[in-house]
Each structure stands twice: as C-alpha cells, then as structure tokens.
A protein has these predicted regions:
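A conserved, positively charged/aromatic
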Residues: 110-111, 122-134, 253
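A donor-sugar binding/catalytic signature common to diverse glycosyltransferases
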Residues: 90-101, 111, 252-289
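A nucleotide-sugar donor-handling region in carbohydrate enzymes
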Residues: 133-202
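Catalytic donor nucleotide-activated moiety binding site of glycosyltransferases and closely related
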Residues: 49-62, 211-243
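Catalytic binding pocket for nucleotide-activated donors in carbohydrate/polymer assembly enzymes
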Residues: 272-317
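Donor nucleotide-activated moiety binding/catalytic core segment of transferases
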Residues: 74-81, 228-266
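C-terminal amphipathic helix plus adjacent low-complexity
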Residues: 320-352
C-alpha cells in the first residue's frame, strides 16, 4: 500500500510551503518524505523549521546545457531516493525533475504553480501533473497554454504565502543576529534571479548605486545575494549588511521600513505583513498574484527597473509609516492553499 506523501523543494519559497505542508500532515500522523535542492537558503529554511529532508541536486546555472545536465542528474538521484518508497503522491511547485520521476513511476503529481511566465518550467511539469493548483488570480488559459488539462486545474482564492504567513509571529531576536538596534531603520533587498530561464539578459546592474543611495539617507540595507559575486560586491559598501547564515527573514521584514526585491515571494511576504514592498520584474508580463494582492489592499508595488522605482523608494524613505498598512483583516480573508492540497490528495486516493 502506498502511504507516503513526497514533497520536493527547489527554492526558499518552496521550502517554506513544504514546511507548512509537512507540519500539517505530520500532525495528523501521516508519513511525509521531503527532498530538497541545494540553492540559496532552501536547505537552511528546512533546518530552521525543523523539517527532515534529503538533499538532492544543485542549481544548474545560467546556460541551457548546465540546466539540462542538472535536470537529468537530479532526476536520476531522485529516482534512487524514491524508487523503493511507498509514495502515494508528489507535491511540488513545478519541480521538473521530481514531476518527471513521479510520472515515470506512476505516482500522481500534485503541482502548484503561480508563475505562468516561467514557460520552460511550466511546460516540463503541468502536462504531466494529475492536479494543478493555482491562485484564482492566474487565468486558467495561461495554465492550459502551458499544457495543463482543464479538468486537472483547481484554483483557490488566495496566494501560496498564506500557508505560512497567516499565523506568523515576528521574533525580535533576528535584529540581534544582525547587530541592529530596535527602531533602527533598514531596507531589505534582494537582486533579481539573473540566471532564470525566463530572463534572457542580465538585469539589475544598477543595484549597487541603489544601495549607495539608500545608505546615504542614513538607512541601512540588509542584502540577500543570490550568487557569491553579489555578496563580495555588496560587502564593500558601508552600511550594507550581508547575512552570513540563514535567519528568520520574515521576522526581519516585520521590522524593516521597506522591501525591494527582484523576486515575487519576498515582496508578497512583506506586503502581507503591511510593509511597503517593491517587486522589480523587467518583462512585459503580468504578475497576476502581485496584482491580486494590490487590488486587495496590500502595499505591494511593481516596477521594471530600480531607476523607475526610485521616486517611490525616496518617498517611502522620507515617511515609512505613511506607507505601512494594517493587513491582519485582509490576510484572514484569503484562502489557504493547504485546503486545495488536501482535497487533491483525497482525489488521488492519498488520504483515504
């Protein structure tokens, strides 16, 4: 009898969601098995959350050949990990290697996807998925365009981040970890994912100028690099703090005056805490979940470049309280993705 639920995490966001799913199902006495890729803070978040995992594979890099090699290598390693286990379903956020292995072994894949702009990842996962779970903000036609079967799509009125943000309580210890004083103004920053398949050109070369501008206003910057070369450049700027280890980033956002990120997750998390959050995304493509949160009243903003965002950044630095929002009521109105995940597991016979 297949009775184990397999979770696979590729990114820090996915580690957060996997942690929420793991805790939910383990509390009900279910068997849960977690695999995770070595990338950014993915493994460290699982460790901070107390989630046992098997590290499998690494990030592929910038070139198509490197990505393909990493995909194939990780698929083989995942096969070795799961082939002898009694797995009833895979849950992932569009993990190409994991979904391919699950499909080959006849394991139903339940795939979450809120990034239809990530074309390659979507095409590699959605056609092979038994269930596709997505926020209602993402048009069904976008998922179908990527190969999802219409009857497989299950949408919910919320965003993925609700799973771990709704009950989150900030811990001021994170300030001590970075030698920041209570009430000391700082901005949290993270650069874009320059090596992502959906970004064909380098983006965000003026990030150093922006950090220098912020610290010139006597506001510190806590910078989370994606790659080693970004770390070394940021550490040369006085007033910029580059964490040396994984920490409670969500608590950190709670005490910041603003978040500036080249990704979507950090901006959504920050805005759900009521902190003004700027997402920088260079493509002419809608960010459906960000737009959804903005329409709901969360303080999330989107620009194509740092220079385009500079006027708003300057205004927020002048008066951060003016842009902060009490979001507790707004957050409680959003649906938790754990609900459609549970119903999907029941549908594939995993919770019967």
């Amino acid at each position: 009898m297949r009775d184990s639920i397999w979770l696979d995490a590729l990114t820090p966001k996915q580690a957060r969601l996997c942690s929420s799913i793991y805790k939910e199902f383990k509390s009900k006495g279910l068997k849960v098995f977690v695999t995770a890729r070595e990338y950014a803070e993915t493994l460290q978040i699982l460790e901070l959350e107390g989630v046992p995992y098997r590290p499998v594979g690494k990030y592929g890099g910038a070139s198509k050949a490197e990505k393909l090699i990493a995909y194939a290598t990780r698929a083989q390693a995942l096969l070795d990990e799961v082939n002898t286990r009694s797995i009833c379903a895979l849950i992932s956020l569009s993990s190409p290697s994991a979904v391919r292995v699950a499909f080959g072994l006849g394991i139903p894949a339940i795939t979450l996807n809120d990034t239809p702009h990530a074309f390659h990842v979507g095409r590699l996962t959605l056609p092979l998925s038994k269930k596709v779970i997505s926020p209602i903000a993402v048009p069904k036609k976008e998922l179908i365009r990527l190969g999802a079967e219409e009857q497989a799509i299950l949408q919910y009125d919320g965003v993925d981040e609700v799973a771990w943000m709704r009950s989150y309580e900030p811990n001021p210890e994170v300030l001590r970890d970075l030698e920041l004083k209570a009430g000391e103004p700082f901005v949290v920053m993270r650069p874009p994912e320059e090596k992502a398949a959906y970004l064909s050109n380098s983006f965000g070369q003026d990030i150093l100028d922006l950090m220098r501008f912020i610290v010139s206003k006597e506001v510190k910057v806590v910078f989370f690099p994606r790659y080693p070369e970004q770390r070394s450049l940021a550490e040369m700027i006085n007033g910029v703090i580059v964490p040396k280890k994984a920490l409670d980033t969500i608590s950190l956002y709670s005490y910041s005056v603003m978040i500036i990120t080249g990704g979507g997750t950090m901006a959504r998390e920050g805005s759900m805490l009521g902190i003004p959050s700027i997402s920088l995304f260079p493509l002419d493509y809608p960010l459906y979940v960000n737009d959804y949160l903005k329409e709901k009243g969360f303080p999330i903003f989107r620009f194509k470049s740092y220079k385009e965002a500079l006027p708003l950044i300057s205004e927020i630095l002048k008066d951060p309280k003016e842009y902060k929002v009490n979001t507790k009521g707004l957050l409680n109105e959003l649906e938790n993705p754990l609900d459609p995940i549970k119903s999907s597991l029941e549908e594939v016979g995993c919770l019967n």
